[in-house]
Regions:
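Alpha-helical solenoid scaffolds that mediate protein-protein interactions
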Residues: 115, 122, 129, 176-180, ...
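TPR-adjacent "capping" and linker segments in tetratricopeptide-repeat scaffold/adaptor proteins
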Residues: 81-96, 138-150, 211-221
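Acidic, Ser/Thr-rich low-complexity linear motifs
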Residues: 81-86, 131-147, 186-199
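TPR repeat positional signature
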Residues: 92, 99, 118, 147, ...
Length: 260
């Protein structure tokens, strides 16, 4: 049996700063995701836990602990004394890392529904540890990454709508995501010490995506016209602003008639 990785990596060079991902068919005849890294490759299952393991006989460690929690709540009519120990949290953090690596790869492959699935899983891990970890350190360990996962979830849901030419739905998702992240960042700035992750960058990425979606909209779309109007007013081009207002009135009237 050939075990040299060069047989896998020939013709697939590592490029610093670039996320290089591909899908292959494994020896079990199922699809796998491979991500090129320096000196090697990471491989993930497409569904279930990324490493293919079934901890405690469950699809994931998260599901195992969620079931534990539900059983505890049924038995004790609440969750006041339910706790996750340090080792539980360490293993959950590792699992969250696996899902993170896969959803980043899936995003490159533009498989947005799968990105939504994995980011939601990551957010569930973060929230579970934050609420039930026995130690403050374990409660806070993943919290700094929540906004990134939320941002990626928002991008995935919005871009899935855009793929279907549902631009206004995609824009609404981004707008809601921006508001949620701005509130989260404001709370962190007010109460938490500075952390190593700049959460404001997540807002910036969504603002940029909002602009990209608006740019791809039809010229008669109200969000696009409103953006053009704001730009004209900022440039003090009042003649252009008047013309755009007329187009907005026509577009709004047509939209109102179509909704009747």
């Amino acid at each position: 049996m050939v075990r040299d990785l060069r047989t896998i990596l020939d013709g697939w060079d590592f490029e610093p700063g670039k996320i290089s991902v591909r899908k292959i068919i494994g020896s079990d005849q199922r699809q796998k995701i491979q991500a090129r890294v320096d000196l090697g490759v990471m491989q993930f299952e497409v569904e279930g836990r990324p490493d293919g393991n079934r901890p405690e006989g469950c699809e994931s460690l998260l599901i195992f602990h969620e079931r534990r929690l539900m059983e505890y709540q049924r038995e004790f009519d609440g969750d006041d004394e339910f706790e996750l120990g340090t080792e539980d949290c360490r293993r959950l953090r590792h699992e969250a890392y696996l899902y993170h690596q896969r959803y980043v790869s899936l995003f490159v492959l533009e498989e947005y529904e799968a990105v939504e699935r994995d980011t939601e899983t990551t957010l569930r891990v973060i929230d579970l540890c934050h609420r039930y970890a026995a130690s403050q350190r374990d409660r806070d360990a993943l919290s700094a990454y929540r906004n990134y996962a939320l941002m990626m979830n928002t991008r995935a849901r919005a871009l899935q709508e855009v793929k279907c030419d549902e631009f206004e739905n995609g824009l609404a998702i981004v707008e809601a995501g921006i508001v949620s992240l701005q509130k989260a960042v404001a709370v962190e700035d007010a109460y938490d010490p500075p952390c190593e992750i700049d959460n404001s960058s997540e807002v910036d990425l969504l603002v940029a995506l909002r602009g990209e979606i608006i740019a791809r909209m039809p010229d008669s779309a109200l969000p696009k016209l409103n953006t053009e109007l704001a730009a004209a007013l900022l440039a003090e081009d009042y003649e252009l602003a008047t013309a755009i207002r007329d187009r907005i009135a026509v577009a709004a009237s047509e939209q109102s008639n179509s909704e009747r």
